[in-house]
Amino acid sequence: KYTADLCGKNALVAKVLHAPHAHALVKSINTEAALKVEGVEAVFTCFDVPKNYFPTAGHPWSTDIDHQDIADRLLLTDHVRFWGDDVAVVVATDELAAKKALREIEVEYEELPFVLDVQEAMREGAPQLHEGFEHNVLGHSSIRTGNYAEAIKEPGLIKVEGWYDTPTVQHCHIENHNCWAYME
């Protein structure tokens, strides 16, 4: 069985409203019409939840504070940093009601400039996505092996310089991301 198979018959369903902008500030959210949809139990927005930051990956690298994932995410955010960022959530008695209510939520955004190139995003004056992190760099890590000072003295050494990147890698789950909880 998968996690979604374990939900009780009386379980409520939550659906998230994703921002349609690459970079924006949420100025206001009107949920009145969404709350009137039959079956809707609650609607929460980025203005309703506390600003408790957590790491994107959701786990620390180690117990060493200098080697942990950066707490840069919020459950719901008023500073949209990518297309699809989470700004509101609907809780309803079934999936259909939740989806209908999502369409009724009115969000006013202030669109902000954005860039699509990593190197451009790190340049001086680039749109800032992460408050408090200069040039949009949240963290830096490197791997060093050998002794560079000695190796550079070696005759015939070939020096290679350039910008190298790797594609995003994501392990693929057999099921969709989901969770369920209950109160005793």
Residue ranges and their predicted role:
Residues K1-L138, G162:
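Flexible, low-hydrophobicity surface segments
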Residues H140-Y148:
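Flexible loop and strand-edge segments within Gram-negative outer membrane beta-barrel domains
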Residues N147-E184:
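Conserved beta-alpha junction segments in alpha/beta enzyme cores
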